[in-house]
């Protein structure tokens, strides 16, 4: 059952930890001549990792914890000692949680208990001068700074994990039905929108158990946000089978059925491909049989199960129909629950260099590889700057600038710094 404060959407900013800096150090021991470099590497920054937890039922914690920050890696030490890697930040979320970027690009989802998803990856530690020593430069006087950890804004949504979704207009009897077929105890009353959050119930039929969701009532134009709107509709996407509950108290049950399907289609046409069961509730009313006869003439291609939650007529028939339809409906493809599913947000081509002519004498250079070495460089260290220039020449930036018409004395902008093209 869901907690009192059910929250199914949150907006957060994630910050993975930066890598620790490598350091410059030399061995200074008595009787050890020309001791050589001894600066250790920095440790890795912590990543932001979301973990599925079957005991979590809401995104309430995420709603109020806007910034999720993993710690930075520890700087290297002398005597060749590497800095410690930072611990990861683990964030527990309910099963059925989906992650998007701020511009609604899909990042990943959590479907199983203890499944993990790496949303923001920690930065690598910078190399100390011991690791940077080469045959040509056996005692470098520079070290690398740690890489920046990934950081960006995300949107998190919870879509309930249920096999069957009960849908219908407000007050058609969804909450009464889930109470009758399971041990769920949602609030039941005679006024509209009694259900304002999903309720789950487990139903068992001849040893086969499945989860049924009582979802908030639907009204016309729900796909535009009316009533519970999209807050309701998004939960249907997880369900394998939909049960349309039509009230015989309605003046036109067939019109209600059409409106329900129209709203599903407007929100996501794929929802109409799901298996459906039509249930007519409140069959104990005086004119219910007459309305049912007309409805069967209007809906000829789908069976209709008449139901009364007063006398519980046909309740077992409905349960067996749910069970049978579910067992003949394949599961949607999902990540292997035995393996952690991790997302890394590295671009497809890290070696691409982009050179844009901003004005007659200013050129902007960007690209993952260029920016990585930029952040690793200590620009207060002359030897480190010389190394940076050698790397840029080696990866072809100088050639790219010349192709764009750069001349000696022109300015080159990389990240937040200006350099002169020589």
UniProtKB/Swiss-Prot annotation:
Q: What is the lineage of its organism?
A: Bacteria, Bacillati, Mycoplasmatota, Mollicutes, Acholeplasmatales
Q: Which NCBIfam families does the protein's record reference?
A: Obg_CgtA, Obg_CgtA_exten, PRK12296.1, PRK12297.1, PRK12299.1, small_GTP
Question: Where in this chain does the record put each OBG-type G domain?
Answer: 162-327
The protein's location, in the record's own words, is: Cytoplasm
Tell me a GO biological process for this protein.
Answer: ribosome biogenesis
Q: Which family does it belong to?
A: Belongs to the TRAFAC class OBG-HflX-like GTPase superfamily. OBG GTPase family.
What HAMAP family does this protein map onto? GTPase_Obg
This protein's name: GTPase Obg
Looking at the UniProt record for this protein, which Gene Ontology cellular component terms does it annotate, in alphabetical order?
cytoplasm
Give its E.C. classification number.
3.6.5.-
Swiss-Prot/TrEMBL cofactor(s)? Mg(2+)
Q: Which residues form the Obg domain?
A: 4-161
* Predominant location: cytoplasm
User: What CDD domains does UniProt report for this protein, alphabetically?
Assistant: Obg (cd01898)
Provide the assembly information. Monomer.
Keyword rRNA-binding listed: no
Enzyme kind, highest EC tier: hydrolase
Positions of GTP binding: 168-175, 193-197, 214-217, 281-284, 308-310
Which Pfam families does the annotation name? DUF1967, GTP1_OBG, MMR_HSR1
Q: What does this protein do?
A: An essential GTPase which binds GTP, GDP and possibly (p)ppGpp with moderate affinity, with high nucleotide exchange rates and a fairly low GTP hydrolysis rate. Plays a role in control of the cell cycle, stress response, ribosome biogenesis and in those bacteria that undergo differentiation, in morphogenesis control.
The reply on keyword Disulfide bond is: no
MF terms from GO for this chain are:
GTP binding; GTPase activity; magnesium ion binding
Keyword annotations of the record: Cytoplasm, GTP-binding, Hydrolase, Magnesium, Metal-binding, Nucleotide-binding
Source organism of the structure:
Onion yellows phytoplasma (strain OY-M)
**What Gene3D superfamilies does this protein map onto?**
GTP-binding protein OBG, C-terminal domain, GTP1/OBG domain, P-loop containing nucleotide triphosphate hydrolases
Q: What InterPro entries would the database entry show?
A: G_OBG, GTP-bd, GTP-bd_Obg/CgtA, GTP-bd_prot_GTP1/OBG_C_sf, GTP1_OBG_dom, GTP1_OBG_dom_sf, OBG_GTPase, OCT_dom
Concerning PANTHER family, the annotation shows:
DEVELOPMENTALLY REGULATED GTP-BINDING PROTEIN-RELATED, MITOCHONDRIAL RIBOSOME-ASSOCIATED GTPASE 2
OCT domain: from which residue to which, for each copy?
345-422
